[in-house]
Curated annotation (Swiss-Prot):
Motif (RxLR-dEER): 43-57
Signal peptide stretch: 1-22
Record keyword Phosphoprotein present: no
Name of this chain's protein: RxLR effector protein PITG_18683
Sequence motif Calmodulin-binding motif, residues: 78-82
One GO location term (cellular component): host cell
Keywords, sorted A to Z: Secreted, Signal, Virulence
Function statement: Secreted effector that associates with calmodulin to interfere with plant defense-associated calcium signaling in hosts.
Record has Signal as a keyword: yes
Comment block on domains: The RxLR-dEER motif acts to carry the protein into the host cell cytoplasm through binding to cell surface phosphatidylinositol-3-phosphate. The amino acids 78-82 in the C-terminal region of are important for binding to host calmodulin.
The protein's assembly and partners: Interacts with the host calmodulin.
Amino acid sequence: MRSFLYGILAFAVLARSSAVAAFPIPDESRPLSKTSPDTVAPRSLRVEAQEVIQSGRGDGYGGFWKNIIPSTNKIIKKPDIKIGKLIEAAKKAKKKMTKS
């Protein structure tokens, strides 16, 4: 079984080296992939009205688009939650847990 594996490996190495030797100049190996600059149309990967947010560290918006958040808020209403009140409630709950 091992000799069969070595035979396949040797065949792959020889086939690769002979294919590379057939095209000594790297540009000749792919003549069909080149296109003339006149026929290439400019492409954009962004859909119209999508702007990428430049986010800071830790703000949670790493690369999302600006129009995703308002459109998501229309589908599912985001409740207004005061983070300070949640932190205070968590501290009170922690104190109760440590007392008992």
